[in-house]
UniProtKB/Swiss-Prot annotation:
Family: Belongs to the asfivirus p49 structural protein family.
Protein name: Minor capsid protein p49
Source organism (scientific name): African swine fever virus (isolate Tick/Malawi/Lil 20-1/1983)
Record has Cytoplasm as a keyword: no
Domain of life: Viruses
Function: Together with the penton and the other minor capsid proteins (M1249L, p17), forms a complicated network immediately below the outer capsid shell, stabilizing the whole capsid. Plays an essential role in the formation of infectious virus particles. Especially required for the formation of the capsid vertices. During virion assembly, associates with the membrane and probably mediates the docking of the penton complex to the inner membrane, where it recruits the capsomers to form the penton core.
Keyword Metal-binding attributed: no
GO cellular component annotations of the record: virion component
Induction annotation: Expressed in the late phase of the viral replicative cycle.
Keyword list, A-Z: Late protein, Virion
């Protein structure tokens, strides 16, 4: 069923001309209430997809329909009530990137990425309804391509004065392309203000660019599977059946370990007191810390290759983040740092379009097979399989661990417990970054 849905979804996107070109009024016809009820997630994932005409969950089992796709609008998080992600094809005409330069490598692999991820790759700017946010600024010299009236998308008059609420909001909604990545600048950690609607008071917000977007780009550049709708924040809108929420976190952890050579440590056996829940909790927390390290480095060094290659500077960045991981005792931390340092040169490709694409092969079963190294079995997920070269169960990785190391004996600090158990975006924040204008 998932395969059939994905095929229809991709056929809609690939149609020439796009199926929704003759249906543009649909983009402005939804009320805020319908948008909220259909697309806002909650702390446990996503609410059911509501029927378009009745606004009731009567047909939620069918998942998102093609009519929904033409008005695709994902929320940045449950508190961002009205900020939507625009349709991929709608935003493509005013992309600042030559199409053949960005999408050549994706032609044969496009089905491997979820629709949400395709939106993330293609999108430069958020399209919002005129009546909801009249202050949204468009990209330079692109107003004539916007779906709404140009008057509803005024240019940013004073981009340097970020204290103005409209300017702050405009910076937030200007999403970056690959060309913008080298220009990212650090603004320092800011305390999240109430300029984006109802937020949790005192929550730290990860800059003007959503953490999820940055993480998707990093995954693409590092050959990791790009379907990470709910990796860090633990929330998102699953495609297909809204009641099926695959454990994308575990998929990312296993693939990240395979590509980076950073093992997540010896997992406790299932017959221990905490069992599988403890393993998953610890592995998720470990990958969160790995991503925090990488994000902190990129934010503070503006993704400049000459700085990324400065290993002493990078080492200083990495060693300043404590604690490293509950899995890694003091004897193992040095080896862990060396592994992180070897990752950095791979990310230079972010700045020059040369990020490699994972090698996917289609299976006759119509599903993907991911090796679960903890069970030495195969678990099915979707239509394609990344060809990994190693994994957590690789004997080469296992021999590097101290034989007497017991992960379950490592106590958690109060800060770790607070960050790991909170389950909201505050656990994912490093330092603020925003596009330079």
């Amino acid at each position: 069923m998932y395969h059939d849905y994905a095929s229809k979804l991709l056929a809609d996107y690939r149609s020439d001309p796009p199926l929704w070109e003759s249906d543009l009024p649909r983009h402005n016809r939804y009320s805020d209430n319908i948008l909220n009820s259909r697309y806002c997630g909650n702390k446990n994932g996503a609410e059911p997809v509501y029927n378009e005409s009745t606004n009731s969950p009567g047909k939620a089992e069918r998942g998102l329909q093609l009519s929904d796709l033409r008005n695709f609008s994902f929320m940045l998080n449950p508190q961002h009530k009205n900020i939507g992600y625009g349709d991929a094809q709608d935003l493509e005409p005013y992309s600042s990137i030559p199409k053949n330069k960005l999408f050549n490598n994706f032609k044969n692999h496009r089905p491997a990425f979820s629709t949400h991820t395709e939106n993330l790759i293609r999108r430069n700017v958020v399209r919002t309804e005129k009546k909801t946010f009249p202050q949204v600024a468009s990209l330079k010299s692109t107003q004539k391509h916007c779906l709404t009236q140009p008057s509803s998308l005024p240019s940013l008059k004073n981009p340097k004065n970020i204290s103005v609420p409209s300017a702050r909001f405009s910076e937030h909604t200007k999403f970056f392309s690959y060309e913008d990545l080298p220009k990212l600048k650090t603004k320092g950690a800011i305390k999240h203000e109430q300029h984006l609607g109802d937020q949790m008071s005192g929550q730290y917000y990860n800059g003007y660019i959503p953490h999820k977007d940055v993480y998707n780009i990093l995954c693409l550049a590092h050959n990791l599977p790009a379907s990470v709708e709910k990796v860090i924040a633990g929330r998102g809108i699953p495609l297909g059946n809204p009641h099926v929420k695959p454990n994308i976190e575990q998929e990312l952890i296993k693939s990240a370990c395979a590509y980076t050579g950073i093992p997540i440590g010896p997992l406790p056996s299932k017959d221990l007191q905490h069992g599988r829940e403890y393993q998953e909790f610890s592995a998720n927390r470990h990958m969160l810390q790995v991503s925090n390290i990488l994000h902190s480095v990129f934010a503070n060094h503006s993704i400049k290759p000459q700085i990324l290659e400065d290993i002493p500077t990078l080492n200083a960045q990495l060693t300043s983040i404590k604690p490293i991981s509950p899995f890694l005792n003091k004897a193992y931390q040095t080896h862990y740092m060396e592994n992180i340092v070897t990752l950095v040169p791979r990310f230079k490709s972010i700045a020059n379009y040369s990020s490699p694409i994972p090698n996917y092969s289609k299976r006759d079963s119509g599903q993907a097979e991911y090796f679960d190294t903890s069970k030495q079995t195969i678990s099915r997920h979707n239509n394609y399989i990344p060809k990994y070269t190693g994994g957590i169960g690789d004997s080469k990785l296992d021999t590097t661990f101290p034989k007497d190391f017991n992960a379950s004996s490592v106590p958690l600090t109060s800060a770790e417990k607070d960050h790991s158990l909170r389950g909201d975006n505050s656990a994912c924040c490093i330092s603020s970054i925003s596009p330079s204008l």
